[in-house]
Amino acid sequence: MKLNLAVVGATGLVGQTMLKVLSERNVEIGELYLYASARSKGKKVLYNGKEYKIIELNDENIRADIDIALFSAGADISKEYAPKFAKNGTVVIDNSSFFRMDENVPLVVPEVNSDKIKDNKIIANPNCSTITVIPALKYIDDKYGIKRVVYSTYQSVSGAGQQGLQDLENNLKGEKSTKFTSQIAFNLIPYIDKFDENTGYTKEELKMINETRKILSKPDMKITATCVRVPVRYSHAVSVNLELEKSFDLEALKAGLAKSAGVVLEDLPMPIDVEGKDKTYVGRVRRDFSVENGLNLWIVADNIRKGAATNAVQIAQQIILLKEVNG
């Protein structure tokens, strides 16, 4: 079934990767509409050998014949335009944070909760670091129950977009950062996004905490997080410490992880090795002997692909499948 698709934010890092993933996965598209800001109007983008002109995103240019729109243009754009697209009957898959905690909007990782898609006109893509850990945590929680989670993230500069990548390159030439508040080359920045005045956590850390609870349907799950920016171009890594409700056989747990959808079990997954891939890679699986039923994991995924673009395209594919089944 060929549906009409739009990509909003088509000139950005994630938007460009969405187009790449759509092509790689051979998603059948009727008409393709590529939107961006006024400064990109008229710019030409190549998709499957055909040139498409960028359409300026404004009220006048919202089309009624778009079946699915992939949004990756930031929370302010999603806030303003996603409801306008949805009002026309378009299903919006939004990569921003704006709708994620809306109780009426499903937060979807297809390997985990594709059943939540149903008839919703707006579907939220989780945060890139949340997507990285959720496939593994879903299996563990279903099988053994999770009492407590401790996240420590190592997030690449591409999580801050093209400007983040440029800062790293510029720093290596001896130039100052413009996106980050500090030098990122040969350095670690111990926070991501703004600080929450009430908790001392950053917005990025609160996203991981709240999104994990929502996706796993455990609003009271005990979770803490520390998110750190590291001088790596692509792929986020997360050290995960868990306290489980049930005792476990380590080898049986690892075998179950290896069979989980979207998960690849490896001894030592590294950011550079998973770049360009669409799975989440789990390694360093071992007991935490400091607590009863404790478990440590190291999880890595390409933040631009599985952490953003690929997850959104997978949701789109699920929607197409539902339309084919339901006619």
Please state what every model-predicted region is.
Residues 258, 263-284:
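A glycine-rich dinucleotide-binding beta-alpha-beta segment and adjacent secondary-structure elements
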Residues 229-231, 301-306:
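Glycine-rich phosphate/pyrophosphate-binding beta-alpha loops
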Residues 123-132, 200-209, 304-311:
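A glycine-rich, Thr/Ser-enriched phosphate-binding loop motif common to dinucleotide/cofactor-binding enzymes
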Residues 187-232:
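Oxyanion-binding "anion nests"
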Residues 241-243:
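Short hydrophobic/aromatic beta-strand micro-patches
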Residues 233-238:
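Conserved glycine-rich beta-strand-loop-beta hairpin in the small C-terminal domain of fold type I
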Residues 250-260:
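Short amphipathic alpha-helices in soluble, non-transmembrane regions
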Residues 1-184, 222, 246, 274-276, ...:
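N-terminal Rossmann-like NAD(P) cofactor-binding subdomain of oxidoreductases
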